[in-house]
Amino acid sequence: MTPEELVHAARAWRDEDPDPETRSEVEGLLGPAGGGTPDVVALVDRFGARLQFGTAGLRGEMGAGPNRMNRAVVIRATAGLAAHLAATGHAGQPVVVGYDARHRSDRFAADAAGVLAAAGFPVHLADRPLPTPVVAFGVVHLGCCAGVQVTASHNPPRDNGYKVYLGDGAQIVPPSDTEISARIDAVGPLASVPRAAPDDPRITATGDALVDAYVAGAVAQATAPDARDLRIVYTPLHGVGRDVLTRVLVGAGFAPPVVVDEQADPDPDFPTVAFPNPEEPGALDLSLALAREVDADLVVANDPDADRLAVALPDPAAEGGWRALTGDEIGIVLADWLLARGRGSDRLVVTTIVSSSMLARLAARRGVAYAETLTGFKWLARAALDRPELRFVFGYEEALGSCVGTLVRDKDGITAALAFAELAASERRRGRSVLDRLDDLATELGVHATGQRSIRFEGVDGLARMRAAVDGLAAAPPVALAGVPVAEVEDMRLGTRLPPTDAVVLRGEGVRLIVRPSGTEPKLKCYAEAVVPVGARAELAAAREHGRALVATILDDAVAGVT
């Protein structure tokens, strides 16, 4: 766009924007009313591109313009979603709309509900901030044709998002994303989009009933009621998980968790953490300090919308006496625990291409079905839905996402926390810890060391620069990973094994590197794995050290190669 075109686009946006806050933002960028120079750089960032609606819905920084999350973008997106639902035979069927506790989430949810109701869809609108798993559960429980959750999960405070579920309770996958995106593009002037008033009878509050039903379903999944002697420290990281998680744990027979007071209440500014992501360094510092103070047995943490679970365990060998598990460690030990509670070869466990290969080995040893999918829980849920002849037991991704059973067809940090608490209590009753069980698995299946690095690409050209980096890796891959010759290069954009995706996989004997763009943030992710066989339990420490060194070298070389 030329500067003149940018100014014209910004003025047109301002004139139809229903939000005085973002209207004022645009006016400031255009310059004083009596004259002045427009801020072209800021206008390019807001109006030179637009947020792309994809399988993750929408997610981005809040502000004015089509490349930001704002009321106008939400109204257009919802009008497109309503048109898609009507065109696919769901006219007049109910939709559930929820939201987290971020800035503007309640306003965006109200706008979405108003558009859907005016389009003829009865709306179940949350009357309070809710965990994302509760809203995903509500799609099926309430008999809806779709669900919308306004959330940016663990993104920085400046961000928000718009997540869409279809009637099976799973996130959208292609081609639904492109079909909805096309409907959004076809939306006319904002004034042409009808919006029902908040008191419209087609909009009803979810009230307590939805949360009550979710809690009952979660508690019904619990087993091993004789093992409940556990002191748990919990943090919702300033998010919305506390009340529901506490009800689930207490309902299953555990004592109420000891909650980190400074992070107990929802706060959209996340003041005690640099990023509200339990994977980030420092995010669990307050939890671990409290755990040492109260002599806890387990630390569990949710991200702000409670769809992810982080875990830490007492470990005398770790710095500070506590060790935070990786997403792969949480996933593999939960899978082993859940498989041990049942029988049958018709059971299914699922993970993603960037997660550890250890789950595949575990499934083979336990004689159960295994599926591997593209990154993202939308694909894990589909793997279960596409195999109705199998009983889905568990799915996980390395980014702290887990799905226990079929209550929720998305990642759920609350039911995962319950399952992990049961596992920890059961091991404690036997005089062991979860770390002992992880040692058992490493001895049986080999040490699977994993790690990742992220490279951020800021600015309006960030996506283009990320794609160029992936292109370069596929065209000229390294000949070795940490000294191990590369035996295979898989360009997953070709879709030969799974649906096409922006990723390149390099494999060698016992080593692997995957490079892919993030689906929700402007960054390139590099995932490494090194598998080290173990002959005896006494070899574990050396094998783990060797695996960590291999992974670090692979990642160092990968970052150097794409920057």
Give names to the regions the model predicted.
Residues 292, 296-298, 319-323, 341-517, ...:
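Phosphate-binding and adjacent anionic-ligand microenvironments
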